[in-house]
């Protein structure tokens, strides 16, 4: 067989593989509706209930990613800084609540000692 024939066969085979493969996969992949219909009724109900919440969480995540990408720093460093900031706020809140509880205990102790 000539070289031109070999090249043509390879081009046709490559085209069939490159175009036909993804087309075949797309044709056998179930749609979201078909997958949803395969769920049992409990999963369908739970999926419908949690859909809005998950959509909101995803929107919040995308918003945070946009904020992080505006920074000159890497997204990973910006995310890490935000986590550290949240952790510091949580620690401060916990220490405030511990201080309030300690002050309340001291006041209660003073009241008890003062009444005796």
UniProtKB/Swiss-Prot annotation:
Q: Where are the transmembrane segments?
A: 7-25
Q: How does it sit in the membrane?
A: Single-pass membrane protein
**Residue ranges the record marks as coiled coil:** 77-116
On the tree of life, the source organism's domain of life is: Eukaryota
* Residue span of region Disordered: 86-116
- What's this protein's name? Assembly factor cbp4
The biological processes this protein is annotated with in GO are: mitochondrial respiratory chain complex III assembly
The cellular location(s) given in this protein's UniProt record come to: Mitochondrion inner membrane
Give the GO cellular component terms, alphabetically.
mitochondrial inner membrane
The family note in this entry says: Belongs to the CBP4 family.
Alphabetical UniProt keywords: Chaperone, Coiled coil, Membrane, Mitochondrion, Mitochondrion inner membrane, Transmembrane, Transmembrane helix
Q: Main localisation, per the record?
A: mitochondrion
Query: According to its UniProt entry, what is the function of this protein?
Result: Essential for the assembly of ubiquinol-cytochrome c reductase. It has a direct effect on the correct occurrence of the Rieske protein, core 4, core 5 and apocytochrome b.
Keyword Transmembrane listed = yes
């Amino acid at each position: 067989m000539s070289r031109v024939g070999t090249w043509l066969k390879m081009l046709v085979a490559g085209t069939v593989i490159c175009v036909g493969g993804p087309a075949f996969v797309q044709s056998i992949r179930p749609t979201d509706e078909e997958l949803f219909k395969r769920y049992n009724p409990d999963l369908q109900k739970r999926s419908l209930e949690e859909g809005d919440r998950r959509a909101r969480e995803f929107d919040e995540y995308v918003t945070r990613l946009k904020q992080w990408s505006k920074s000159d720093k890497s997204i990973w460093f910006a995310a890490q800084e935000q986590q550290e900031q949240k952790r510091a706020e949580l620690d401060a809140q916990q220490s405030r609540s511990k201080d309030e509880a300690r002050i309340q205990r001291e006041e209660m102790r003073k009241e008890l000692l003062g009444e005796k």
